[in-house]
């Protein structure tokens, strides 16, 4: 299946007038805005249906660890593992990785639902391919292939001896008198370290909505990020059917990225499937195929090929002038829809006036969304169902989803879309789900309702970790009023020797592995410089001036971003419909990932410019 064709700057003649479309966008946003109440607290139901350690985890007891290390890394996902490898490359082996799950892998450990897969090209998403010599089997790797690669990384660099699994960090505190971080866990561990790396990830803490009657439902229920194969049958690899669903009626609440991947597999195996939708996703095709040596060998021959390919992907999305051969261009195939960004960057280079820029961008956006809505009509047989599956909002309001089989699943007689007209489900009963005033009886209910995302969400809510800085203030308290203040999104004043990996104030592209690479490079070099023999300092933090300047850069263009977010239906990108409540400094670094990486390299080249040392 091909990707959506490149965009014209004006809508197709066949689509509705622009004014009609924009009015439709506003109507759809308003009806959802009135019924959007984000859940900010964990409840007993949260712990029951989305347990911290997941389902079927082994019991794990051990003696408390009391030790001092150079580095403690919190999180054994891709960010934590890549950072660990980079530390070893710097000759630093005195580190501990604390992981709350039974295994490492982060997002891919928790999200083992059927159909879980990456929609970024595997050659740039799977980290450390060049170093391990592994070539992915598919253009877009399955969750099973990614988890196998995580195990490969751990084995190659002997990281197993550094990892403490099933260990939830509860608090960390900076001791200025000792220049050490104190780390406490749920195993009564007492660790100290000179450097603390927060690699706590993005999609691991389930967002479980408070639906009245959840405790009364008599069937099974769980969050998609804590899939229970004992209930469904099957396995994470998808090698066998979910045979226990053959006689069951299943309900799925949520049609975001996870729900879209789950539905096709459930449609195959369940006796009956109800899909409860508040807001439809924008669905485009994903052209997956087996990677052959003929395809990969020209790519992987040159040293440094993976980093170079990540940069090529970034350059294509940021519309930079770059000569690329046909085979290089395959890195962004399927991302033609993201040429919106090229439109925007092209206007910036041409010094288009801001007022005119918004107009041209809106036209391009409408054209793209008309293409996506037409794709729905061409795929879904039933006209009424197709109309309900059409997204009516600007393209980047919600995460774009690339999936071939989701829309066609609704052509099955056993699959029924329950569109809630933007209101969400009303409540649960003993037998099922009430939506639109009607009870839908189900045997199993699956919450594909996403995760607590970083932007605008308190750190403790996402991690269950209190982080205390040099003045006894928590990270959440420090950021409560105006939002985050950082240098590069990594260093935080009054939290010495703390190094943070996340999207906030950092360079971000659709391939978050690229962000991880650049952050891990910087972190490992900074720690390496501090630990060099003869180093005259043991602690670092950003200067007031450097941090303030970085925050100011992050806030640039915030007015245009706010205006766009206000046009969107509620979601985690816009604070669940209240973007004005989220300070601009929660945003990404607006100049892009390459400028971000260059700024960090300049810092290191100029003797850690912008960092105080003592």
Curated annotation (Swiss-Prot):
Its cofactor is FAD. Binds 1 FAD per subunit. It catalyses: gamma-lactone-2-keto[5.5.5.5]fenestrane + NADPH + O2 + H(+) = penifulvin A + NADP(+) + H2O. The record marks 399 as: Transition state stabilizer. NADP(+) binds at residues 255-261, 278-279, 398-399. The keyword Lyase does not apply. Pathway: Secondary metabolite biosynthesis; terpenoid biosynthesis. Keywords: FAD, Flavoprotein, Monooxygenase, NADP, Oxidoreductase. One of its GO terms (molecular function) is monooxygenase activity. FAD binds at residues 99, 107-110, 119, 125. Its EC number is 1.14.13.-. Disruption phenotype: Abolishes the production of penifulvin A and leads to the accumulation of gamma-lactone-2-keto[5.5.5.5]fenestran. Belongs to the FAD-binding monooxygenase family. Baeyer-Villiger monooxygenase; part of the gene cluster that mediates the biosynthesis of penifulvin A, a potent insecticidal sesquiterpene that features a [5.5.5.6]dioxafenestrane ring. Within the pathway, peniC is responsible for the final regioselective Baeyer-Villiger oxidation of gamma-lactone-2-keto[5.5.5.5]fenestran between C1 and C2 to form the delta-lactone moiety of penifulvin A. The first step of the pathway is performed by the sesquiterpene cyclase peniA that generates the angular triquinane scaffold silphinene via cyclization of the linear farnesyl pyrophosphate (FPP). This is Baeyer-Villiger monooxygenase peniC. The gene is peniC.
């Amino acid at each position: 299946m091909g990707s959506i064709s490149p965009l014209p700057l004006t809508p197709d003649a066949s689509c509705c007038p622009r004014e009609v479309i924009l009015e439709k966008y506003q109507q759809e946003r308003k009806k959802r805005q009135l019924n959007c109440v984000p859940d900010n607290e964990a409840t007993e139901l949260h712990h029951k249906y989305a347990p911290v350690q997941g389902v079927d985890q082994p019991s794990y007891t051990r003696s408390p660890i009391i030790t001092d290390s150079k580095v403690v890394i919190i999180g054994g996902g891709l960010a934590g593992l890549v950072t660990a490898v980079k530390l070893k490359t710097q000759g630093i082996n005195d580190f501990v990785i604390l992981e709350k799950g039974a295994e490492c892998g982060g997002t891919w450990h928790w999200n083992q639902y059927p159909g879980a897969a990456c929609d970024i090209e595997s050659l740039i998403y799977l980290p450390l391919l060049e170093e391990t010599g592994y070539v992915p089997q598919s253009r877009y790797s399955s969750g099973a292939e990614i988890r196998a690669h995580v195990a490969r990384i751990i084995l190659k660099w002997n990281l197993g001896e550094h990892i403490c699994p099933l260990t939830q960090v509860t608090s960390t505190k900076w001791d200025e008198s000792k220049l050490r971080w104190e780390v406490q866990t749920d195993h009564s561990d007492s660790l100290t370290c000179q450097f603390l790396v927060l690699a706590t990830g993005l999609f691991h803490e389930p967002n479980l909505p408070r639906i009245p009657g959840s405790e009364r439902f008599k069937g099974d229920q769980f969050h998609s990020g804590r899939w229970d194969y004992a209930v469904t049958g099957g396995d994470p690899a998808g090698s066998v059917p979910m045979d226990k669903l053959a006689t069951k009626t299943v309900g799925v609440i949520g049609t975001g990225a996870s729900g879209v991947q789950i539905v096709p597999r459930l449609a195959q195996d369940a006796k009956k499937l109800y899909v409860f939708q508040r807001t439809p996703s924008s669905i485009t095709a994903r052209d997956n195929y087996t990677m052959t040596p003929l395809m990969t060998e020209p790519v992987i021959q040159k040293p440094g090929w993976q980093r170079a390919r990540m940069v090529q992907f970034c350059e294509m999305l940021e519309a930079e002038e770059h000569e690329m051969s046909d085979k290089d261009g395959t890195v962004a195939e399927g991302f033609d829809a993201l040429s919106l960004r090229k439109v925007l960057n092209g206007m910036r280079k041409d010094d288009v006036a801001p007022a005119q820029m918004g107009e041209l961008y809106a036209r391009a956006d409408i054209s793209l969304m008309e293409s996506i809505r037409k794709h729905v009509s061409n795929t879904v047989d039933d006209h009424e169902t197709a109309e309900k599956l059409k997204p009516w909002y600007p393209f980047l309001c919600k995460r774009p989803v690339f999936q071939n089989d989701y829309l066609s699943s609704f052509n099955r007689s056993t699959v029924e879309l329950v569109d809630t007209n933007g209101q969400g489900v009303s409540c649960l009963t003993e037998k099922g789900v009430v939506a639109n005033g009607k009870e839908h009886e189900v045997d199993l209910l699956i919450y594909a309702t996403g995760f607590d995302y970083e932007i605008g969400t308190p750190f403790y809510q996402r991690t269950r970790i209190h982080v205390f800085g040099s003045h006894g203030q928590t990270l959440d308290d420090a950021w409560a009023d105006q939002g985050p203040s950082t240098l590069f999104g990594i260093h935080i004043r009054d939290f010495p020797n703390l190094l943070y990996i996340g999207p906030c104030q950092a360079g971000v592209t659709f391939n978050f592995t690229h962000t991880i690479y650049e952050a891990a490079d910087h972190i490992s070099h900074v720690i390496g410089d501090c630990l060099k023999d003869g180093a005259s300092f043991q602690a670092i933090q950003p200067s007031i001036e450097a941090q303030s300047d970085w925050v100011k850069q992050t806030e640039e263009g915030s007015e245009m971003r706010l205006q766009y977010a206000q046009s969107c239906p509620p979601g985690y990108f816009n604070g669940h419909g209240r973007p004005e409540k989220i300070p601009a400094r929660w945003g990404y670094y607006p100049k892009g990932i390459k400028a971000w990486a260059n700024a960090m390299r300049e810092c290191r080249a100029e003797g850690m410019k912008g960092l105080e040392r003592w």
